[in-house]
């Protein structure tokens, strides 16, 4: 499946993310406030421009022989995903937040502190998860055009991405 635009992917509100609002996980914006302030030697540097979702190549032979499916099957539809772990079965700490396995609200709070010049730390994870925990997240897909609404009075399209109520409804019904 090919996409000429990058979709927005959200973890729905209350999806074990510690957030009462949906969390935008693709493209991730958590570190946008602090990206320019993070030194390259900081453990946070690897999070500064994280993209965890990507399109599979059109030719399955490119990846099917390189990976072992431990459970389930390869995606066959545009709205399916595959979780790829490291060879030793571990994952990036940031992926735990994306999957709603760690408290996203706590992460954002720490990032906000760092952005305002305070000190903050993000604990490294050594958690172990079950198959059911890893497969439980349900993501919501929002195309960029859906974040705009026609304003007949002004004769323009209005970006509603900062309107939390609009976005909550849009994501809930996606």
Spans of model-derived segments:
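Basic-flanked hydrophobic alpha-helices used for secretion and membrane insertion
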Residues: 1-174
């Amino acid at each position: 499946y090919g996409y000429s635009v990058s979709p927005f992917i959200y973890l729905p509100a209350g999806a074990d993310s510690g957030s009462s609002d949906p969390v935008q996980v693709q493209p991730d914006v958590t570190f946008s406030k602090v990206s320019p302030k993070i030194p390259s030697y900081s453990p946070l540097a690897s999070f500064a421009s994280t993209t965890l979702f990507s399109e599979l190549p059109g030719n399955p032979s490119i990846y099917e022989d390189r990976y072992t499916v431990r459970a389930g099957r390869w995606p066959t539809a545009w709205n399916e995903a595959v979780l790829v772990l490291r060879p030793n079965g571990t994952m990036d700490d940031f992926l735990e937040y994306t999957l709603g396995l760690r408290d996203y609200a706590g992460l954002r709070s720490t990032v906000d502190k760092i952005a305002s010049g305070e000190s903050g730390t993000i604990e490294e994870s050594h958690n172990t998860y079950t198959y059911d925990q890893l497969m439980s997240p349900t993501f919501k897909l929002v195309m960029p055009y859906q974040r705009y609404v026609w304003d007949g009075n002004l004769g323009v399209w209005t970006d509603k991405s900062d309107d939390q109520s609009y976005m909550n409804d849009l994501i809930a019904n996606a």
